[in-house]
Amino acid sequence: DEDVVAQVPPSAKHFNVLLHTLDRMKAERPGRLIQNITRLAEHFKRRSIVALISDLYENPEDLLEALKPYNYLGNDVVVFHVLDPAEIDFPYREPSRFVDLESGEDVPVVPEGFAKQYRELVQAHIEALRTRCTEARIDYVLLNTARPLDEALFSYLGNRERLARVR
């Protein structure tokens, strides 16, 4: 969204509130992810786990630059990159019209000759995000929308807890 539309105070007791808040979110207007990330950094006064959940249609360098202050403040940052399987695989074979959920723009697409290039660009973007996050010591998790978000979050937190015990 263009602005921060909801904020849940940090607390282990607020996890269910966080999940319900996320469940109610709808893509309604164009987003300004980088500006909102930058603006929210000042609200983190104590060490926290900062989870960014987004489709990440942003420049990887700009995104990582916006996330740097969170690391500097001692936060553990995890980026959940949420994509629909069709956004990754582009399974379409017939000419189609796509509607951008944020802008409402109608985009005609002829898949022939476009699908291969599209898949390559998406994979390159995913890999750039993964690489930049790893370099910045930020956890990167690619999430498929076919998997429930709460299940993915619990799985990540469980893996994180197991790794902490090993260290």
Label each residue range with its predicted role.
Residues 1-167:
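Exposed, interaction-prone extracellular/peripheral surfaces
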